[in-house]
Amino acid sequence: MDVNHFLISSLLERWRSETHTFHFPHGETTVTLEDVVVLLDLPIDGDVVTGPITVQDIFATFHEHLGVIPPPTVIRGNSIRVSWLNSTFQQLPPNANNEVIAQYARAYILKLIGSILMPDTSAARVHVMYLLRLANLNVVRNCSWGSAVLACLYRCLDHGIHLRQENIGGCMILLQCWAWESVATGIATGGRTEKIKWV
């Protein structure tokens, strides 16, 4: 889905970090956990999605959970390039055993986190702490991923207005779908509905 940059820019202009709400002429509104559940179907109850900010041996972590050791050129600090994940885990090998299937599943979820759900401003890197949360795929659904996505979006909106960034991180699909669903697109005037031009 393409992101409507004009819509996102207009929303960003109305964002207030003090209240984590958008200020419109008709009042304040914001993306809520309920919106995350309805629009993304992510769990909002369960274990907090958190982890260590630094990982002692990032190469060992990738080898343990993904079965490969990434080249040092794709790692910066405690994050890895999403493009490397895309190219390395493109096609599941035929006759893959359960361990390889789990490694590819972790890589796929990690790509989703880094490029769609909780991307940074570049949407090009993902933090290794999320890989640690994916270690046991049987309990991944027990984490409050929706809360993490919403917190990341709020933080990215805050940074977007305070740091005057060119690009903004966070789940833009959530923000855009929420705007289409929640922000008034029409008003009743004399029995008919007219479009509001607020963007």
Label each residue range with its predicted role:
Residues 1-154, 170:
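N-terminal leader regions that mediate targeting or early regulatory function
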Residues 81, 85, 174-175, 180-199:
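Extended, charge-rich alpha-helical regions
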Residues 98, 159-160:
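Helix-loop junctions that connect tandem helical modules in alpha-solenoid scaffolds
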Residues 109, 165, 193-195:
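Generic N-terminal leader/processing signal
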Residues 160-168:
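Acidic, serine/threonine- and proline-rich low-complexity regulatory regions
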